[in-house]
Amino acid sequence: MLPFRTLLKWSVNRNCCRGFAVSQQNYNSVKKGLVLGVYEKEKEEESLTLTNAGDAVDNAVLGKLRDQLARSGPSLKKGKSRIFYGLHEDFPSIVVVGLGKKSAGVNQHELWNEAKENIRAAVSVGCRQMQDMEIVQVEVDPCGDAQAAAEGAVLGLFEYNEMKKKKKKAVTTHLHGSSEITAWEKGVLYAEGQNLARHLMEAPANYITPTKFAETFEQRLANMGSNVKVFTRSKQWIEEQQMGAFLSVAKGSEEPPVFLEIHYSGSSDASQPPLVFVGKGVTFDSGGISLKPSSGMDAMRGDMGGAATVCSAITTAAKLKLPINIISLAPLCENMPNGRANKPGDVVKAKNGKTIQVDNTDAEGRLLLADALCYAHSFNPRAIVNAATLTGAMDVALGSAAAGVFTNSSWLWTHLQEASVVTGDRVWRMPLFEHYSKQVTESALADLNNIGKYSRSGGACTAAAFLKEFVTAPHWAHLDIAGVMSNKDEVPYLRKGMSGRPTRTLIEFAARLSEDKQTI
C-alpha cells in the first residue's frame, strides 16, 4: 500500500454489566463514578432536560443535580462535560455529559444516526475523565441507547500501552439505572471486536508477525465450540493451492507466509451458503523493492487492517451467536526487499491462471487478495466482502470520513450502507467502470498490470478494477479502508492511533444479512 499517515497507542479494558466482573463486596469497596447525560436546549427558554437515569439521580439527591448544573454555567453543549463532587453518597464523582439535541436521529446528509454518534462521543468523554481521576469503577447512563453507550465507553477507554512500563489504571464500566442489559452487552461485544482489531494493528510488527497473528485467533477461538473452526495454512499448502501472486510477495521476507481460515457455522441450516470475508494481511509493508519513504513507514505495521477487521468481525459474530454461516480468509505475509523479492517488471501467475506484470512492488496487497478471492469462490458463497488498506489514493479521495466501497451488487451495497448508518462507521460507493478495467488489462508482458497504465490517476479505482478480474461471484464488495486506518481526532470516541475501522460495520452487516432470507 502506498504511504499516507502516521499513528499511535492502546490498552485493554474489561467492560461489562454490574456484577459480572467483580464481587458485590469488592465493588462496593472501590471508588466509583457515574456518567450521566443531559440534552442540549432546543430553545433558550426551555428547562433543562436530563435522561431518565439523570432524573432518577436528581430525585434521589433532592434536585441538587439540576441546581448545580444551572449554577455551574450555560447549558452543556454536545460532547462537553462537567464534574460534580459529593452529590450522591454512592458516587463521590458524577460527570454530566452533553448529548446534543434530544430530537437528533438519522441525518440523511451525514448518513449516520446522529443520536447514536452523540451518545458514543459523550460517554467516551465522561469515561476518560473518570480514568484521569483514577476512578476504576464507572457506571454509565444508557442515555436512551444502551448499545451506543457501551460502544462509547469501551471504544473511548481503549489505549495501546502494552510496551510501556507506566500504564493508566484500567477502568471497568457498568450499565446504570436501566434494564437494557442485553443491548449494553451487545455494544460491549461490538466495541471489543473493534478494539481487538485496533490492538493487532497497533502492535509492533516484530510482535505481530503472520504466525503470531494466526496464533492470536487460534487462542481466542479455541473454546468457542464445535461450530467455530480455525485452519492455519502453511507455505506448503499455499504452494499446493498455486497462489503464485501471494507467494511472490511473501518471498521477500524471512517470515513465512500464513493463510488463516476461520469458519463459523451459526445457521441451523448447514447447507446455507456462507458470507465470505477476505482481508489483506500484510503485517509490515516496506514497499519491497519499490521502497517507501522512511518517514511514516512505521505506520505500515497496520497494513494488515483488512485481515484484523474481518477476523475480529467473525470472532464477534460467533460471540453474538448470529444465525449465519461466515468464513473469514486472511492471506498473511510481510512485504520486504530481500534478494528474492519481486522486482519491477516481474511476471507472476495467480491461482486462476492469469498472469500479472508487477510494475510496482508497493502495490502488493492486490496480489494477496487476487489469490484469496479466487479461493473464496470455492465455498459457493452467498456474498464475498473483502477489506484492505489498499491505496493511498483512497485516503486522498475520502480521507477518514468513510471507507470506499466498490461493488457489483446493489443488494450488497444497500446492506453495507444501512449497517454503516447504524454504526456511524460510514461507507461510500465508488465506481467500477470499464474505463478502469481497460487500464489494468493492457499490459506489455502479461494478462494484467498491477498498477494500470496511468499509474497516478484513479489509483483506488484501478486497484478495485484489478481485483474484479478475480471475481465471478454476482455479489462482491471491495472495501478500501486505507483512509480510515488511523485516527487523529476525527472520530471523537477513538483515541489517536489505529482505528480498527470498519469492524463494527462488518459485524452489523453480518447481523443484518442473517435476518435477510432473500434467496439470491
Curated annotation (Swiss-Prot):
Its EC number is 3.4.11.1, 3.4.13.23, 3.4.11.5. Substrate binds at residues 280, 285, 290, 292, 303, 362. Zn(2+) 2 binds at residues 280, 285, 303, 364. Pfam families: Peptidase_M17 (PF00883), Peptidase_M17_N (PF02789). Its main location: cytoplasm. PROSITE patterns: CYTOSOL_AP. Gene3D superfamilies: Leucine Aminopeptidase, subunit E, domain 1 (3.40.220.10), Zn peptidases (3.40.630.10). GO terms for cellular component: cytoplasm. Keywords: Aminopeptidase, Cytoplasm, Hydrolase, Magnesium, Manganese, Metal-binding, Protease, Zinc. It comes from the Eukaryota. One of its GO terms (molecular function) is carboxypeptidase activity. Mg(2+) binds at residues 285, 362, 364. Its cofactor is Zn(2+); Mn(2+). GO terms for biological process: proteolysis. InterPro entries: Leucine_aapep/pepB, Macro_dom-like, Peptidase_M17_C, Peptidase_M17_leu_NH2_pept, Peptidase_M17_N. The active site is at 292, 366. Homohexamer. Cytosolic metallopeptidase that catalyzes the removal of unsubstituted N-terminal hydrophobic amino acids from various peptides. The presence of Zn(2+) ions is essential for the peptidase activity, and the association with other cofactors can modulate the substrate spectificity of the enzyme. For instance, in the presence of Mn(2+), it displays a specific Cys-Gly hydrolyzing activity of Cys-Gly-S-conjugates. Involved in the metabolism of glutathione and in the degradation of glutathione S-conjugates, which may play a role in the control of the cell redox status. This is Cytosol aminopeptidase. The lineage of its organism: Eukaryota, Metazoa, Chordata, Craniata, Vertebrata.
